[in-house]
Amino acid sequence: MSHIDPRHIHISDYNYPLPDERIAKFPIAQRDHSKLLIYNKGEVSSDVFYNLPQYLPKGALMVFNNTKVIQARMHFRKGTGALIEVFLLEPAEPSDYELMFQTTGHCAWYCLVGNLKKWKEGSLRREIEINGQTVVVNATRGELHGTSHRIDFSWGGDVSFAEIIDAMGELPIPPYLNRETQESDKTTYQTVYSKIKGSVAAPTAGLHFTPEVLADLDAHGIQREELTLHVGAGTFKPVKSEEIEGHEMHTEYVSVRRDTIQKLIDHDGCAIAVGTTSVRTLESLYYMGLKVMRDPSLNEDQLHVAQWEPYTGDSPQCESVAALKALLAWMDARSLTVLHSSTQIIIAPGYDYHIVKMLVTNFHQPQSTLLLLVSAFVKGDWHKIYDYALSHDFRFLSYGDSSLLIP
């Protein structure tokens, strides 16, 4: 364990000047023609993203997050004319994502509510057209749940909630783009391999990949695996406290197939992560493995990785393969083919990486937890990387350019 206590890191030490014109408001026309910064053991160079496969070791395992962004912004107009925005955050009833999108007639979500002061009481109502039939959607506000509200939705007809949000929802693009969602975002703000609905923000490192780049990875002998972490709105939550001890990470829900964990074991517990969401999931698997080594009787909910868990010193450290094997044995004892759990892990300087050996990621906001994750990975060399990107005309944030980090 590193001697740094990340709780006392000052977020102001992770600031840098980011002019608005360097924030990519739209993606470039061809995803894989974005620029690629390569950081290799302290040396920095640049290339084009479609050449990524040639920088990766043959036979390596690359892990992608296959979550799909949902049209989470729903608008209702009150009889008074007031516009209320209901932003879906997390399923409440049913709480399972897959069941939620299949459900008909009624469901409940934890949501952020915009223009809340105008919604004192009563239900919101909106008529929409689905497959030629008129469907009336009602929304009723329930109890406060942290900073979000429970919203109960009800509607008529044999229509799933997935169809409801496809018809009336709007794709939530990042707030720092400072523009309205456009029709093109429905395509460009999804990865080409997105499958499992549930995120309210894209795992943007994956936006550069095309079918051609994926085929080229295969041709280079790179093995590919997928996992699912549903990205929450908290990914844009600024760090407002002076020290990061005062910042609470949001809980994110993860699903990992048994086969993927076996593949990680076959690769000596090492992986190339596509994006910070894949990093958080992979590194959380290590701590889940430590938990079941200590107590094999735990259930899935008890595998949740708390924010500061890696830094407490309570967990005996071990090789990543041993932790993954313990997790696999725990799954097999329960005949589980997919692990469903959650993580709140914060990765910051002072963190020792266990599974992720290379990282593909975009350029992140100043003073963000994602920048802390990158700094922990490149052992503080983030200044060198970001100075290079700023001086070589790289585009920043969600629709910006990419980097391959090899510490």
What are these regions (language model features)?
Residues M1-P407:
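Surface-exposed, charge/polar-rich loops and edge strands
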